[in-house]
């Protein structure tokens, strides 16, 4: 009889928990069902790697999954649920990229930013690394998970569970873990204490060292559907249905991008200004040594903005060129870019982006992203890119 009552109680707890945080997540039904089913069946890998692009919901799902694990084995599931909802459960731990700022002058670790982290997750659960660094006032720096953080993780997980159940460590943007930190955590991830669960979240699994990756069970998240994004914009952001559908087609499966498009993120206006200044100078630079100085000044300006901003800008440039290509090849229904700069007409620019130069342009932009990500000299990288762009834009398309 006691066993039957226990089973009945557990089923009620599971139903209650499943109806809470998981139902706030956009789409990803297959992922949610897989995680819940494996947990109910007692198949809970001790180290899991959630792999998904920005805005796909990896962090919200990791938190919801942690909530399920922690509340499922609690004597008071409602209280446990509430604590996880506030990100204040004593058995839920976080590690994420940080760096020094005005408040934290040295040895930055996640614990010193927990208040800001809770606000960030509450307000931007689908937010990017760039958004996070903006929120702590360091968008001009690169966040990192360093060896000090790794030591903190080890220290936290050596302690017994406060509530006698699981301990969950969520490592967000795990690709930002440097080699020293990864090596410190290697043995712990391979052989964690009993009832300790690691949830590593990444947008780029190739940047995580293989010895860490091989010790985790990988779970790949697809991008969100346009329908899921549109429905969520209507429900969460009070968007009209027509506007939500338009933005959903632009968002490329990224809910974070959709929200910023809806609210017309001011970064895009700055990026548009930088891009058009760059393009105009690149057009004039061929055979005009005086204009080369304009490209040097432009490169210096962007180089001062910080690496995360530079990476965001280069991604914006990729999108701009692709939109121009679509317009050039008579697919205006796929073009969503709305230019705010006076006297710049995308229709007039589009013919300069074509089959003979688009692959080279994309390659050089991606190469620049790669080198900036790896701490290359931004001024030199951007100036080199500018010189190449000057050649590409003057390349003629072959006529048949």
Report residues per predicted region.
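Conserved catalytic/switch belt of AAA+ P-loop NTPases
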Residues: 158, 183-194
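Short, positively charged and aromatic/hydrophobic N-terminal segments
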Residues: 5, 9-16
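Clamp-loader machinery-focused feature within the broader ASCE/P-loop NTPase space
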Residues: 15-176, 180
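Residues immediately C-terminal
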Residues: 176, 191, 207
């Amino acid at each position: 009889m006691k066993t039957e009552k226990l089973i009945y109680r557990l089923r009620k707890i599971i139903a209650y928990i499943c109806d809470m945080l998981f139902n706030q997540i956009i789409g990803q039904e297959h992922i949610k069902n897989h995680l819940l089913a494996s947990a109910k069946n007692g198949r809970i890998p001790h180290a899991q790697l959630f792999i998904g692009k920005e805005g796909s919901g990896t962090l919200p799902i990791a938190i919801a999954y942690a909530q399920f694990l922690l509340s499922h084995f609690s004597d008071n599931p409602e209280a446990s649920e509430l604590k996880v909802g506030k990100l204040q459960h004593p058995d839920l731990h976080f590690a994420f990229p940080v760096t020094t700022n005005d408040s934290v002058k040295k040895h930055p670790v996640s614990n010193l930013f927990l208040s800001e982290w809770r606000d960030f997750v509450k307000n931007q659960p689908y937010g990017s690394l760039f958004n996070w660094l903006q929120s702590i006032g360091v968008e001009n720096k690169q966040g990192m998970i360093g060896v000090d953080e790794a030591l903190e993780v080890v220290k936290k997980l050596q302690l017994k569970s406060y509530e006698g159940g699981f301990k969950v460590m969520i490592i967000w943007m795990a690709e930002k873990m440097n080699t020293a930190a990864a090596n410190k955590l290697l043995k712990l991830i391979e052989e964690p204490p009993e009832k300790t669960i690691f949830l590593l979240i990444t947008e780029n699994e190739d940047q995580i060292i293989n010895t860490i990756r091989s010790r985790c069970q990988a779970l790949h998240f697809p991008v969100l559907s346009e329908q899921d994004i549109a429905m969520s914009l209507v429900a969460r952001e009070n968007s009209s249905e027509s506007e939500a559908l338009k933005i959903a087609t632009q968002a490329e499966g990224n809910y974070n991008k959709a929200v910023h498009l809806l609210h017309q993120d001011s970064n895009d206006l700055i990026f548009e200004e930088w891009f058009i200044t760059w393009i105009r100078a690149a057009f004039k630079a061929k055979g005009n040594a005086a204009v080369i100085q304009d490209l040097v000044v432009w490169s210096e300006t962007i180089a001062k903005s910080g690496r995360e901003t530079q990476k965001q800008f280069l991604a914006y440039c990729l999108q701009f060129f692709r939109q121009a290509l679509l317009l050039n090849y008579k697919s205006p229904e796929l073009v969503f870019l709305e230019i705010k700069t006076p006297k710049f007409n995308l229709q007039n620019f589009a013919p300069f982006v074509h089959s003979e130069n688009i692959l080279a342009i994309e390659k050089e932009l991606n190469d620049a992203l790669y080198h900036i990500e790896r701490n290359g000299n931004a001024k030199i990288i951007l100036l080199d890119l500018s010189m190449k762009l000057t050649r590409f834009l003057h390349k003629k398309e072959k006529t048949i």
